Amino acid sequence: MRHPLVMGNWKLNGSTHMVNELIANLRKELSTVEGCGVAIAPPAIYLNQAKHELSGSRIALGAQNVDVNLSGAFTGETSAEMLKDIGAQYIIIGHSERRTYHKESDEFIAKKFGVLKEVGLTPVLCIGETEAENEAGQTEAVCAKQLDAVLNTLGAKAFEGAVIAYEPIWAIGTGKSATPAQAQAVHKFIRDHIAKQDAAIAAQVIIQYGGSVNDKNAAELFTQPDIDGALVGGASLKADAFAVIVKAAAAAKKA
């Protein structure tokens, strides 16, 4: 059985005080939770602080981005080896905000995926469609294209131990969310698409849902067979709301 993962993406939020307080509250809220992996991705400047605050807990450290280069004259970038050195494990790539604001292509994101695998880190590959693409019935075609950038260059084996986050762009930060049935249909498509190349890998890959997951809708989403946790945005900045989501994932997979 797949082990669900709930990951908090803090985006461009934080302060030294907030990092200490939020992690302390998360540790308290999640101290007895079992059966669900948990990770947080603070801004890069707070990774070292977060690492120390998480010490001895079951909460893993993640990051929000990585560069394709390992070293050199690339001002402002952070390499996979640096993230590994600091203790980060789960690295978000392909987030719609990176694709939109930084014009990151599927091919560029696939390179990031490969670099992370090479150094032993876990890619959290975000894929998903815009509202216009959704309304045009292109959801599956868009997700397939984004997956194929990795499948066609690195093969299905690259998804062993990796994480995929399906994030319908029209549902991010909008308060809208796909219904559990809608989300399940896309998650099943993603798993089936990988299974065309390797059924065993497809069966074990974690596929999170990442479209406005909150403490109100999480439990119903997690009852779906192909939804393995969540990539959480705004709700991850509140320890109590994030804990409800984690507990819902753990409970759903025990049922």
From Swiss-Prot:
InterPro entries: Aldolase_TIM, TIM_sf, TrioseP_Isoase_bac/euk, Triosephosphate_isomerase, Triosephosphate_isomerase_AS
GO CC annotations on file: cytosol
Catalytic activity, EC: 5.3.1.1
Main localisation: cytoplasm
Active site: H95, E167
Chain residues that bind substrate: N9, W10, K11, G173, S212, G233, G234
Keyword presence, Cytoplasm: yes
Gene3D superfamilies registered for this protein in UniProt: Aldolase class I (3.20.20.70)
Superkingdom classification of source: Bacteria
Reaction catalyzed: D-glyceraldehyde 3-phosphate = dihydroxyacetone phosphate
Catalytic EC class: isomerase
Pathway(s) of this molecule: Carbohydrate biosynthesis; gluconeogenesis; Carbohydrate degradation; glycolysis; D-glyceraldehyde 3-phosphate from glycerone phosphate: step 1/1
Alphabetically ordered keywords of this record: Cytoplasm, Gluconeogenesis, Glycolysis, Isomerase
Molecular function, one GO term: triose-phosphate isomerase activity
PANTHER family membership: TRIOSEPHOSPHATE ISOMERASE
Described purpose of this protein according to its UniProt entry: Involved in the gluconeogenesis. Catalyzes stereospecifically the conversion of dihydroxyacetone phosphate (DHAP) to D-glyceraldehyde-3-phosphate (G3P).
Similarity comment: Belongs to the triosephosphate isomerase family.
Quaternary structure, from the entry: Homodimer.
Protein name as annotated: Triosephosphate isomerase
